[in-house]
C-alpha cells in the first residue's frame, strides 16, 4: 500500500509541479507530498514520486480512470484530524492511500472521482 501525507495545491500550479501532462490535459485537483505529487486530471490520475526524500530518480505512474475499481473518503470530524482518501487501482490488492492534512476540502475530489466513474 502506498501511503502519502499530502497538502492540497492549487490546480493552476500543477504545470510547474510536473512536466508529464499532455497537450490539452486539464488538472482538476493537485496534491503535493514530501516525496512527490499526485494530479487528478480530466483524463487520468498521475502519481510522480521518489522512494525517499534523498532519491534523485522519480517514478511516474499513470492510471486512466477506467482502472479505478472504487474509492472511499473519510473526512475528519474532530478539529485537527486528517481526512483520508483510498483509491483501488487496477489489479493492485492495496489502495493508494492519501492522508490529507487538517482543513483540506476533499469534496471537489470526491465529486471528480464520482463523475469519472459514473
Model-found features: residue ranges?
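Hydrophobic transmembrane alpha-helix bundles
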Residues: 16, 29, 66-73, 97-98, ...
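Anionic N-terminal interaction surfaces
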Residues: 1-38, 90, 101-103, 118
Amino acid at each position: 500500500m502506498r501511503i502519502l501525507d499530502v497538502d492540497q495545491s492549487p490546480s493552476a500550479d500543477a504545470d510547474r509541479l510536473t512536466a508529464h501532462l499532455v497537450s490539452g490535459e486539464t488538472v482538476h485537483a493537485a496534491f503535493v507530498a514530501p516525496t512527490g505529487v499526485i494530479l487528478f486530471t480530466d483524463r487520468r490520475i498521475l502519481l510522480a514520486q521518489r522512494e525517499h526524500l534523498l532519491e534523485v530518480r522519480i517514478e511516474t505512474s499513470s492510471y486512466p480512470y477506467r482502472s479505478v475499481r472504487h474509492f472511499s473518503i473519510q473526512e475528519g470530524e474532530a478539529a485537527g484530524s486528517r481526512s483520508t482518501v483510498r483509491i483501488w487501482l487496477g489489479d493492485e490488492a492495496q489502495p493508494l492511500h492519501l492522508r490529507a492534512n487538517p482543513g483540506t476540502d476533499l469534496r471537489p475530489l470526491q465529486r471528480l472521482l464520482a463523475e469519472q466513474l459514473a
